[in-house]
């Protein structure tokens, strides 16, 4: 901000000086009297020609200066919104404050459209109008915040163009000034609150997503830990949280763990999907026609060719000779490691690409904004907030059989976000097996990104996932599910290495025998569960992840049960129930 100001000041000063110089040179080099007795060269140097040369030089210099000033100002016009220095300096300018107070942005309503369920609204308290977020920390990773000093995040930033267009009907009762357009989103405020409260009760960092099929409308997207959007106005609190996001990102409430992004924009980190990724491997195998294999699983584990390293089952279980259905139901690592090798690197890469995975270090990162269905959001603004990091596998020619086998069970080089796993559950839960873009907006067309697997293959995968909750690894957790409800799913237990922190949230650093410092790393076991409900005619797909929550059946699956029951209570299964009755009749 200082450089453009200085250049503008210099331009103004030099412009004034230029005018004075023009007058001075014109007077100094005015035509001499006709009777001056001097050689022609002297008369020429003292006349109009010299004046023209002076003016030409000054014009060129002034033009260069103007181009420089224009360039700097143009830079700030296009880069202002993404520059923290510019955003924070707005607070010092009274003109910006008056401009902001002259009009209001639109309200953001949940899918019901009811005022009492608004996600973002205004409040008129004795003539003082303030923007508030009724769900608070339960939805701040969605709603975001809006502040003079620290900018905006979430919906406030992603839909800012829509929210500032002057058509709000709700704000007219609050203010006579210019008002923005209202926005109704796909979120169900009641389900959103329920999801967040379930994560908080888990007592560990966690995330959950619920999608409404077939259009993948986001019903709930919760992340914990969280923060109250009102804290954004407290500069010391916000700076402390921002600093933590830089130094201890694993602990930061600013991270939207459902997406793997920061609420203010930008990527954060990935997760390993664990055994939930066997859903992908099973789907690829079924669709590729190699699902009838019987593999032997031994006490010593399965050693991929040329690796010398074995892959064993959780807790040392030995399943013996086993087929796909039982292997999926009991989450047999050895079976799926062998199945992944049977499907083969190239075919796995093909199916992974259908889900927009990067499968090689040489792959160019795809534009993750393509994974969303947008109508009212500005793509660039939306992408900076809600576009999850590129999902990754390593299925390049350099990948060893061990690498391929390990990735087939959701470990190794598999890098995913929670929403990616929800989308996989959606793809196999949909009747046509399509990979569909999620959306926060209502009334849009279903955006099919790719045909992941055939409808017949999807039906077979759903059958496998139904077994998991009936008599497999999730049967204990789903024993408490309302008997009128059915579901399908897959548990996951994922090993991951993270930074170790002290009680104050600082990374623990140690010094090795050579005097070099290292950040201490520890292993954690994340708990996962993905799936759909009802089982016969899915209406929702979901994914739940609890960091360091242990086995998927112990932490994530019970949360999924509660989400299914809440979704049913809110009426999202009524169409599916009627369809089931029609088929039986």
Predicted regions, residues:
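Periplasmic/cell-envelope proteins involved in peptidoglycan metabolism and beta-lactam response
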Residues: 1-248, 253, 257-275, 290-293, ...
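Beta-lactam-recognizing serine transpeptidase/beta-lactamase-like catalytic domain environment
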Residues: 214, 218-275, 280-548, 552, ...
């Amino acid at each position: 901000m200082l450089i453009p100001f200085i250049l503008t000041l210099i331009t103004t000063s030099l412009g004034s000086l230029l005018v004075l110089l023009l007058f001075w040179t014109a007077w100094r080099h005015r035509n001499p009297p006709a009777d001056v007795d001097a050689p022609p060269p002297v008369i020429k140097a003292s006349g109009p020609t010299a004046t023209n040369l002076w003016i030409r030089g000054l014009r060129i210099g002034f033009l260069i200066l103007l181009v420089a000033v224009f360039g700097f100002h143009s830079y700030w016009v296009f880069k202002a919104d993404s520059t923290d220095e510019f955003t924070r300096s707005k607070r010092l300018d009274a003109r910006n404050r008056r401009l902001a107070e002259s009009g209001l942005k639109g309200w953001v309503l949940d899918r019901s459209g009811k005022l009492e369920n608004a996600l973002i609204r205004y409040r008129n308290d004795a003539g003082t109008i303030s923007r508030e977020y009724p769900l608070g920390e339960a939805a701040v990773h969605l709603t975001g915040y809006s502040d003079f000093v620290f900018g905006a995040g979430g919906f406030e930033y992603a839909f800012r163009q829509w929210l500032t267009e002057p058509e709000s009907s709700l704000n007219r009762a609050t203010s006579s000034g210019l008002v923005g357009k209202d926005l109704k989103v796909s979120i169900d405020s009641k389900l959103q609150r329920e999801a967040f409260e379930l994560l908080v009760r888990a007592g560990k960092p966690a995330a959950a997503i619920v999608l409404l099929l077939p259009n993948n409308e986001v019903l709930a997207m919760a992340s914990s830990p969280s923060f109250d959007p009102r804290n954004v106005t407290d500069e010391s609190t916000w700076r402390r949280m921002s600093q933590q996001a830089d130094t201890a990102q694993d602990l930061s409430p600013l991270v939207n763990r459902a997406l793997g992004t920061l609420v203010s924009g930008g990527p954060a980190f990935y997760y390993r999907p664990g055994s939930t990724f066997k859903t992908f491997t099973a789907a690829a195998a079924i669709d590729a026609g190699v699902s009838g294999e019987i593999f032997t699983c031994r006490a010593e584990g399965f050693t991929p060719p040329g690796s010398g390293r074995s892959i064993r089952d959780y807790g040392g279980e030995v399943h013996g000779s086993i087929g796909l259905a039982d292997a999926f139901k009991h989450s047999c690592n050895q079976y799926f490691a062998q199945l992944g090798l049977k499907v083969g690197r190239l075919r796995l890469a093909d199916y992974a690409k259908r889900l927009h995975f990067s499968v090689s270090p040489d792959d160019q990162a795809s534009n993750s904004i393509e994974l969303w269905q947008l109508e009212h959001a500005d793509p660039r603004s939306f992408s900076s907030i809600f576009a999850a990091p590129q999902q990754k596998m390593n299925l390049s020619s350099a990948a060893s059989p061990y690498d391929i086998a390990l990735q087939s069970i959701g470990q190794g080089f598999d890098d995913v976000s929670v929403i990616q796993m929800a989308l996989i559950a959606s793809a196999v839960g949909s009747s046509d097996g399509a990979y569909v873009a999620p959306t926060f907006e209502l009334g849009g067309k279903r955006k099919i990104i790719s045909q992941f697997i055939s409808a017949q293959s999807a039906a077979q995968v759903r059958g496998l996932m139904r077994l998991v909750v009936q008599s497999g690894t999730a049967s204990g957790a789903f024993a408490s599910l309302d008997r009128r409800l059915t579901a399908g799913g897959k548990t996951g237990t994922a090993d991951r290495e993270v930074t170790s922190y002290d009680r104050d949230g600082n990374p623990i650093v140690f010094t090795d025998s050579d005097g070099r410092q290292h950040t201490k790393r520890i292993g954690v076991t994340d708990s996962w569960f993905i799936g759909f409900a009802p089982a016969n005619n899915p209406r929702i797909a979901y994914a739940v992840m609890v960091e360091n929550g242990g086995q998927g059946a112990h932490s994530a699956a019970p949360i999924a049960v509660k989400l299914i029951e809440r979704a049913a209570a809110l009426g999202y299964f009524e169409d599916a129930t009627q369809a089931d009755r029609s088929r039986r009749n």
